[in-house]
Each structure stands twice: as structure tokens, then as C-alpha cells.
Amino acid sequence: MAEVTFGAEISEDRSLCAVAKAWREANGRIAVKVVWRGAPVLAPDVMDALYMSDDPVDTAVDPRSQSATLCAKLAERGVPVRRLGPEDVAVAHGEFMDLVASGRLKHFEQPELTAAVRGAQARPLAGAQALERRRVGVDQSPFTASEFAVWALQRWEETSSPGVYVV
């Protein structure tokens, strides 16, 4: 199996948490799927189990969101977390939208992700755009978690690829 990454996001009203998984398929496209959605209080245990079963190369969370509460709980369980900054969140959104527009992203027609995409609105962030999480009528956590999982996969691929280093 190819390397996988996870992204996690707790909804603005804290009623749900979404965990998305991203990987690169043999044809070169990135695939992303919401693999769990449930009560935020259960998320650390679920993510720990996913970490043990799927052996991800990275897990991405925005610590400046409702998801900040996941960071310490995941660390306690030994799950490493990449904490995204504002620029990372903006890049995650832009790259995700570019992959969608170019047909290089595979998703799985999941109703919760489709609803989030249809209800999505952009907001300015770090000189670019990101998802508006607060003033929309539908839970954006599946969309945001998916963006973060894809972002983490692309960053891992950049740093793990062999290259020429100047010393």
C-alpha cells in the first residue's frame, strides 16, 4: 500500500469530527476519503487506532481551530501531529482546489463531503483564500479534513523524494 496521511477537523459547533485519509494511486492521482466522522470526544481513540492500522506518514491538524483540543490528546497517545499555520491552511485550500479543477483528485462521492463542498465559501487568509468555517449552513469538517490530508501528503512527497542537496 502507498503512503497515507490523515487530516482531522472538529466542526465549528463541536458536534462532529471528521478524519480524512489521502494517498497517491498508481495512476498518479491523489485519492482522498473521509474515513471517520463522529463525536469529537471519540476522535483521539479513533485516530490512534487508525494510526496503528494504517501507519500514516503524517497527520495534519489546524491548532487555531476547534481541532486544537486534539493536539495534546493525540500526542498523549503517541500520534505525531503536524500543526498547520495560517499559510499552510491557505496553501491546503488552494492546492486542493487546483487538484479538483485539473481532475487530479479522486474522491468517493461521500454525502458528507459533497454537502460540505456544495455549501463551501471562501474567506481571505494569509494573502490567499481558505474555507470559511463559521458562517456557513453546513458542517465544513469533512472538506477541511480532506484538504489537510491532501496537503500533508504533498508535503511528505516533497520532503521524502530523492533530490540534489547543496551543502
Language-model features and meaning:
Residues 1-86, 90, 94, 107-167:
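RNase H-like, metal-dependent nuclease domains and their acidic two-metal-ion catalytic environment used
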Residues 94-103:
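Short, surface-exposed amphipathic charged segments that create phosphate/polyanion-binding patches used
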